UniProtKB/Swiss-Prot annotation:
InterPro entries: PSII_PsbU. Belongs to the PsbU family. It is found in: Cellular thylakoid membrane. The gene is psbU. It comes from Synechococcus sp. (strain JA-3-3Ab) (Cyanobacteria bacterium Yellowstone A-Prime). Gene3D superfamilies: Photosystem II 12 kDa extrinsic protein. This is Photosystem II extrinsic protein U. Residues 1-28 form the signal peptide.
Length: 120
């Protein structure tokens, strides 16, 4: 009887394992909704915090964009090697929210563009 019960449990376990999918298919995550800004972000001279206005940018993508500025065009932004396909899609979807002002070298040091030091 004990052997029969053990065999039935083993068969049941084997059936359960066969019926459970071994992998979950990858599903592309949906992009956050695009928000239209009244005043576009000057990607060459802005600070990290300004990207908080755009869903999906702050802090990771915003940091990448600030660190790799200046850009001449949207295509320049999309050439950053560390961008994922989803991040590129997010940048393209928000293209109307960016302007490419003339880079003001020395006006905003990189560490100040990343951390303005607001601790209050």
């Amino acid at each position: 009887m004990r052997r029969l019960l053990s065999a039935l449990v083993s068969i049941l376990l084997l059936l359960c394992l066969c019926l459970v999918p071994l992998g979950i298919p990858a599903v592309a995550a949906e992009l956050p909704p695009v928000k239209h800004l009244d005043t576009p972000i000057d990607v060459n001279n802005t600070i990290l915090r300004n990207y908080r206005q755009l869903p999906g940018f702050y802090p990771t993508l915003a940091r990448i964009l600030v660190k790799n500025a200046p850009y001449n065009s949207l295509e320049d932004m999309l050439q950053i090697p560390e961008l994922t396909e989803q991040q590129k899609a997010l940048i393209k979807a928000n293209a109307e929210n960016f302007v490419f002002g003339e880079y003001q070298e020395g006006a905003n040091q990189l560490e100040n563009r990343i951390n303005q030091g607001y601790y209050g």
